[in-house]
Design a protein with these regions (language model features):
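C-terminal leucine-rich, beta-strand-based interaction scaffolds used for sensing/assembly
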Residues: 1-20, 29-34, 84-86, 100, ...
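N-terminal pre-P-loop "Q-motif" helix
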Residues: 25-32, 39-63
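Walker A/P-loop nucleotide-binding motif
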Residues: 66-92
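Conserved NTP-binding/hydrolysis module of P-loop NTPases
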Residues: 109-135
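Conserved P-loop NTPase "ATPase switch" module shared by AAA+ and STAND
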Residues: 127-179, 194, 463-468
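Sensor-1/coupling segment of RecA-like P-loop NTPase cores
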Residues: 160, 164-212, 218-222
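Conserved small helical "lid"/interfacial subdomain of P-loop NTPases
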Residues: 209-258, 266
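Catalytic cores of nucleic-acid endonucleases
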Residues: 440, 458-540
Length: 547
């Protein structure tokens, strides 16, 4: 407590992104939330000033016992920094001589509720030996509740974080009845005192409160850093990061959504160049986001709300207006939010994961829609992802004509490796094979058409700049092709057409078969094939119009 009392008394310091404050973590117990806080050996953590600190503190200062509001719900999307703001609030309230009962982690609270709360109470009454003795004598939660009830002459400030851990849908491994009991105990304990609760926006209780007029104040914290906060984050951490130009910084801001929790992974990477750091960042964010995101959608896919969900996801992906008739349970509030009647995703990785999910579900109509195609106009760093999805979805729906061959897609399948590709030899059947991983190194897709004893195989690469692109033809013929060729009957006529889809039509080129001599045998480098360069307009005129 001595360290807390030495903190800056100026509340504006906590709202100023130029300030990096070293704060003592305001919970004395052993089980601190080290998954969310980097706490050093002296018990301190760093807090970059956040503008929303002022909003939260101002709201708390409006509390009035008996004649006004006494409860505040703080909720929001994943990784905003709610927990750091609340811990800083706890420090400031302590510093201004208010008694704070700070409970930072309801997951840990549920393991041993009595000891966990007693630790918080010890700090609240650090300067009152008589009260410390009373707290020490509490043997169960009823004793704690009675103690708090008896403190009617002095208002306590209860700050309870991570309340989603007590939600019935949160998999904490704690019995549902125990969760309900803890919720009841917390409510009784904080009754007649000031009560600040925080949770992710997906919490069932929060979803109820968000859409009801209740007797509590509410603060929503969506997204990540604003422009000024992001600028100061770069200034503070530039020495610890690989060198980046402005475009690469914009790319990083897009993929992370400027979310503090996600930006933290960039600091962990320890990579010396941007490409490796970005790859690590993508890997870590995918691990954190993809499973919970798709699990939520999978549950809805089995209900009668699936079409609502798909339409709503399309609105989120394209930052459009929400559809009429949607409900609070039709989308995942951790990753998506609606503000001023407009739909938003929290970060680019969420957008990409949801786009890939709906793409694999066959909802190609989303990606040929002009609202999707126009997306990259406001965000050039994602134009490759947007246009690739639009091109491939357009081919799925309308086909493509190249080298006088019409590829009208009958079926599409997703592949992780060449082993997943099994060519159909049914007459006039065209199958479109699509890689599960976006930005697959060799190709973006592969068409296979069997017609009049000929198997037409057409690998596809989508790019804005063919000249600056890696040699996908060489990569395909050295990587995937040797694995595909043994699956093709020897007596079958094969025609290979490598399709480049880019800004403008180019000149078709007939490429002859090449070999390299290896000891006593010749090894094929590539078969005879045709290299075709076709413009976006031949796939979808809207793509060409908005590029």
């Amino acid at each position: 407590m001595e360290d807390i009392m030495k903190l800056d008394e100026d509340e504006s310091s906590y709202s100023n992104p130029k300030k990096i404050l070293s704060l003592p973590f305001p919970y004395p117990g052993q089980k601190k939330p080290i998954d969310r806080f980097v706490i050093n050996d002296d018990g301190f953590f760093n807090f970059m000033g956040r503008k929303e600190f002022k909003n939260v503190l101002t709201t708390i200062n409006k509390f009035r016992s008996g004649t006004g509001y006494m409860k505040l719900f703080v909720y929001g999307t994943v990784g905003y920094g709610k927990s750091h703001i609340l811990s800083a609030i706890a420090c400031f309230l302590f510093q201004t001589e208010r008694r704070v009962v700070y409970i930072p982690d309801c997951r840990q609270l549920s393991v041993d509720p009595v000891d966990y709360v007693k630790s918080a109470l010890f700090l609240a009454y650090h300067n009152d030996d008589a009260k410390i003795n009373e707290i020490n004598s509490c043997e169960n939660f009823e004793d704690i509740t009675n103690f708090c009830k008896s403190q009617f002459k002095e208002q306590l400030y209860f700050i309870v974080d991570q309340m989603n851990a007590l939600d019935e849908n949160d998999d904490t491994g704690v019995n549902l009845d125990i969760k309900k009991q803890i919720r009841r105990d917390l409510d009784k304990m904080a009754n007649n005192h000031y009560y600040i609760m925080s949770s992710s926006a997906n919490n069932k209780t929060m979803l109820h409160l968000m859409h009801k007029q209740t007797g509590e104040l509410k603060i929503k914290l969506f997204g990540g850093f604003d422009e000024e906060e992001m600028k100061e984050w770069w200034n503070s951490h530039n020495p610890d990061l690989p060198e980046m130009d402005e475009q690469q910084k914009k790319q990083t801001e897009d993929i992370t959504g400027r979310i503090p929790l996600f930006l933290k992974f960039l600091l962990e990477s320890n990579h010396e160049n941007f490409e490796d750091a970005l790859e690590y960042l993508n890997q870590q964010l995918t691990l954190k986001i993809k499973y919970p995101l798709t699990s939520f959608s999978n549950i809805i896919s089995e209900s009668n709300r699936w079409e609502f969900h798909v339409s709503l996801m399309s609105s989120f992906l394209t930052n459009n207006f929400p559809i009429l008739g949607h409900g609070p349970y039709d989308y995942d509030h951790r990753f998506f939010y609606i503000e001023d009647d407009k739909c938003y995703y929290v970060c680019g990785l969420v957008r990409n994961c949801m786009a890939d999910y709906l793409y694999e579900k066959g909802r190609m109509e989303i990606f040929v829609d002009v609202k999707w195609i126009k997306l990259f106009k406001n965000n050039p760093s994602v134009k490759g992802f947007i246009v690739e999805k639009a091109c491939l979805a357009s081919i799925c729906r309308s086909g493509i004509i190249v080298n006088k061959i019409t590829f009208k897609v009958n079926d599409y399948q997703f592949f992780s490796s060449a082993e997943d590709i099994n060519f159909s030899l049914s007459e006039a059947t065209c199958t479109f094979y699509l890689p599960r991983k976006w930005n697959q190194k060799s190709i973006d897709g592969l068409l296979a058409l069997y017609k009049t004893n000929t198997l037409y195989i057409a690998p596809i690469q989508v790019t804005f700049d063919k000249e600056g692109h890696s040699d996908s033809e060489a990569s395909f013929f050295s990587g995937i092709w040797p694995e595909l060729k043994p699956n093709i009957p020897n007596n079958l006529n094969i025609e290979v057409i490598f399709i480049w889809i880019t800004r403008k039509n180019g000149i078709d080129e007939e490429v002859e078969k090449k070999f390299k001599k290896l000891r006593s045998r010749n090894v094929e480098i590539n078969p005879d094939y045709t290299s075709v360069v076709t413009g976006f307009a031949n796939v979808n005129r809207d793509i060409d119009r908005y590029v």
